[in-house]
């Protein structure tokens, strides 16, 4: 069991809003269980960036847009994820607007994106996104 708080920052639904552990949040997705919705997949992908899990990032990228290789920014320190909106756009499509904060070489930056997702055979995939 991994009692570490999940990097995605999701909290429990109870009034105290306690941080969920990796095992209770993104861990099942990383272990191969399908994400229940696009927001959960987005959160699990963020956690994969934090953990440096390139195989997971690539496996959850839709085959129509997936790069052959992916190199993560060396020395990046991920600082947090904010989900601004999760919108269902069709029976098997959704969008997630998020802000991911990180620091590289002492410089803080943020990625504000509207990402598109598609569900195929019961699994959600990241397709692409627009930087906002």
Language model segments and positions:
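Short beta-strand edge/turn micro-motifs at domain boundaries
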Residues: 112-132
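Core segments of small alpha/beta cavity-forming domains
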Residues: 29-74
């Amino acid at each position: 069991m991994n009692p570490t708080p999940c990097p995605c920052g999701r909290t429990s639904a109870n009034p105290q809003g306690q941080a969920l552990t990796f095992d209770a949040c993104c861990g099942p997705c990383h272990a191969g269980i399908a994400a229940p919705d696009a927001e959960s997949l987005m959160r699990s992908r963020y956690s994969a960036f934090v953990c440096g899990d390139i195989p997971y990032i690539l496996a959850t990228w839709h085959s129509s847009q997936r790069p052959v290789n992916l190199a993560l920014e060396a020395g990046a320190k991920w600082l947090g994820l904010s989900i601004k909106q999760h919108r269902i756009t069709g029976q098997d499509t959704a969008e997630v607007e998020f802000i991911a904060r990180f620091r590289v070489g002492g410089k803080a930056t943020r990625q504000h994106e509207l990402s598109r997702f598609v569900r195929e055979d019961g699994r959600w995939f990241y397709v692409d996104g627009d930087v906002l």
